[in-house]
Amino acid sequence: MKSTLAILATLVTVLLLLLFVCDDTSFGLKSDNLNGNSLAPQKSADKQSVKNIAIENQWETYSSQWFYCNHQKETKGVALVIHGLNFRPTKMKPIIAKLTESGVDALNMSLRGHGENFTHQDGVDSDKARLEAFKATTYQVWTNEAYLAYLQVRERAAHKEVPVFFIGYSLGALIGLDLFATYQDVYYDRMALFAPAIKLYAIHYLARLLSPFPELIVPSLAPDSYLTNKKGTPVAAYDALFDGINNFEKSANSKINVPTLIFIDEQDEFIPTSGLKNFVEEKKLDQWQIYTVQKGKDVKFGTFHHHIIDAASTGKDVWQEIMNAATAHLLNDRKN
């Protein structure tokens, strides 16, 4: 039922927006204070040029936050954590709390247009500035940011002489995976992926029809408490998502065949479980396992099946089981 509603909502939203779209697609918000290409170096750019551009745009100040493990004597791993599309990066904290409790340091990154990752200027409303950054983003921008975050994680892991882990939800999982497959110097020892957006139900690609209007905002059906931009998601962000999926389909290779645990609700409104299983089989990813999530009875009615990132979205007991499975997977063959 929930999946049907999501599909109908997608159809209705796309049709309505196509009917009523006008020249002023920014809905009263202008991009005067932001340069959409300011964080988008070419793929051939060297690491230092990427880093310089990011620093100029306040990246290191606003796009990542470290959380250190509670074990002062031993760190068992260092994890890169990336959130989903138009999701508050802080919503990854329940996962991070379990990681740090288990002896894993975590770097929680915010993609451009999410959390505090936007150009901060005196006298400019934060919500508007964040949304403008969201409307100006591209998949390459997000990839560059994720790469910079990975370098920090790798450096700390090397210093501690511990494994590098990757934790990604939805869009975040896609970006981390594509980074792994595409960049020769990126490597994760183990991964835990939550509803990875590497496959979508075909109906959602209807949003591609809105590509000529990148600044147009598509309203979201998700609860405000999860949304980093409550007004909705810009078409530009959806285009970036589709670009990422397309890129990953081309780049996916045997390099990503490391111990990986995928958490997915079979009733997910956006990610087809069958598509994930087919991908694993086609790419011969014999170290990947799928963990089917069944939400508990204590979950609020109407909660998206795609949301499996905290106790509120899965149920308290189910969330505990998910976290136990995730940490057991990441810390395999290591003392707990």
Where are these regions (language model features)?
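N-terminal Sec-pathway targeting helices
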Residues: 1-13
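Short, surface-exposed "cap/lid" segments of acyl-processing enzymes
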Residues: 58-122
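Serine-hydrolase catalytic core
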Residues: 72-73, 230-299, 314-331
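Alpha/beta-hydrolase active-site loop
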Residues: 132-157
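Residue in the alpha/beta-hydrolase core beta-strand immediately N-terminal to the catalytic nucleophile
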Residues: 163-165, 190-192
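Gly/Ala-rich beta-loop-alpha elbow adjacent to hydrolase catalytic centers
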Residues: 167-172, 176
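Conserved hydrolase catalytic core segment
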Residues: 178-189
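Active-site nucleophile loop of the alpha/beta-hydrolase fold
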Residues: 192-202
